[in-house]
Each structure stands twice: as structure tokens, then as C-alpha cells.
Design a protein with these regions (language model features):
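Conserved short "hinge" loops at termini or chain/domain junctions
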Residues: 1-50, 87-99
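Short loop/turn elements at secondary-structure junctions
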Residues: 49-51, 55-99
């Protein structure tokens, strides 16, 4: 996942690896708090929606510290939408259907 995040954020070298690894873990926990199933959000997932959400979260947080607040706001808006969609989608949550 670290390599995917670095590629998406156009980060080369290893200077930010520790910080990005922390952000990846934080993204997974944030999705879990929103109700996304922990089995779905493992950081070795191949699920495109989870990967995109984690990358977007990392972009939003990384831009706050090292980039543009405008870009950070755009990433945050996108991440919040992705998180909301995932937290309401069958197959991504632990919620069961009520009859």
C-alpha cells in the first residue's frame, strides 16, 4: 500500500515513508470507525474503492503538512464522500439487513 500511496501522491524517495505508513494505518482505522468492515479494509487489499479511499485520506493529511491547503480541502471533500459511500454499502460493512 505504501508504494501505491507514494505513486499517487508523486512522492519519490523514502523520507516520508514512516509518516505515510502512519497515515495509511490512520485511514484504515478511520474507515473502521465509520463502520467499514475491518476485513475489507486491510492494507493489503486489492479492492479498488478501499485503495482509493486510503490514498485520498493520505493525500488530504499529507497536503495539510507539506503542501497546499486548497488541495487538502479537495482531498478531504473527496475522502468524506468515499467514506460515506463505503459506510452505507452492502459488502463493505458489518451491518446486517433488518426485516
Amino acid at each position: 500500500m505504501l508504494d501505491r500511496v507514494k505513486l499517487a501522491l508523486l512522492i519519490t524517495g523514502n523520507d516520508f515513508d514512516s509518516e505515510l505508513t502512519d497515515l495509511i494505518d490512520a485511514a484504515a482505522k478511520d474507515l473502521g470507525i465509520a463502520g467499514v468492515d475491518a476485513l475489507v479494509i486491510s492494507t493489503d487489499t486489492n479492492d479498488a474503492l478501499i485503495i482509493r479511499a486510503i490514498i485520498t485520506y493520505c493525500g488530504y493529511q499529507f497536503e495539510i503538512m507539506h503542501g497546499s491547503l486548497d488541495r487538502s480541502a479537495a482531498y478531504k471533500k473527496s475522502y468524506d464522500e468515499q467514506k460515506a459511500q463505503l459506510s452505507m454499502t452492502t459488502g463493505y460493512t458489518t451491518w446486517t439487513a433488518q426485516t
